[in-house]
Amino acid sequence: VVYTPAIPKDHSELNFFIDKHYELKKRSEVLGMITKSSYTIGIAGTHGKTTTSSMVAHILKSAGMNCTAFLGGITKNYGTNLLLGNSVGKKYTVVEADEYDRSFLALYPDLAVITSMDADHLDIYGDHSYMVESYRLYAQQVKQGGRLIYKSGLQLADLEVEKNTYSIHGDADFNGDN
């Protein structure tokens, strides 16, 4: 039985499975197992996860890539939060890497994207510095030969991983301009 931290510990159905000794796994743990066998793009951040992961999945699908995606919201163009690729050939998996409950620490992406690290879920982290430290741990879990891409200005420049920054202000490795 797969569950998320959004399910309260006193939820009757969750407790039924606990009482009957069913095997329970957190969603993040299952995602970690699923993504081991594919090229994984994990997108984290307090803002922009769903938009960014949906866009990346759509780009891969539109390019004809074998893409599976676990998204945080229902996309308008697909009408679902789960896109399934096939089991043939190179597989790409896009995962919305949720920072709540430190769930993203179950992932070891080939490409990690961090969009923001604003104070959020302080009921879990206690204060902003502990939350930032969890993001830093997530960034360091990029697989050997992988890469971290993050918004310029985030406290990640000192990490010893292959990395690039992005911005719309001209102060990054990749810059958006209109």
PLM regions: where:
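Phosphate-binding loop of NTP-binding sites
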Residues: 5-165
